[in-house]
Amino acid sequence: MVKQALKIGRASCREILTNKDALFNADGSANVTSNNAVLGQAIPYNSNYGISTNPESFADFTYRAYFTDKKNGVVLRHSADGMEEVSNYGMKDYFKDNLRSQTGYIYGSYDEKKNQYNVSLPTSVNNSVSYSESINGWPSRKSFVTE
């Protein structure tokens, strides 16, 4: 998957096929074909999200990828289910307010022991918050900031 800074064209997140390509039908559905090229066609996701200028917010574990979209003030998870705003689970206003006002880095990390995605906002609120898949929410706010 490729993350772009801002929405470009129809989508800002794209899947790039490897060793295959896609042929599109008139209805927009794709047929995947074999190809000798290492990288195939970029297929856009139907979303309005991008990683803004904060690639350091990206973290992944197993089949899930997490990142922030500062421009839209959201935290996102990309998985087999598609793109989802995990910031909507109890922290929508917090991220709308604090991501947009963040002037520096937005650090993302994944804690494999606790199975949590951590987001650190050092300049706007000087703390970290963690998203947990097991409760589908944000169980903790931490006083440390990831470096």
Tell me the role of every PLM-derived stretch.
Residues V2-E147:
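Beta-sheet-dominated scaffold domains
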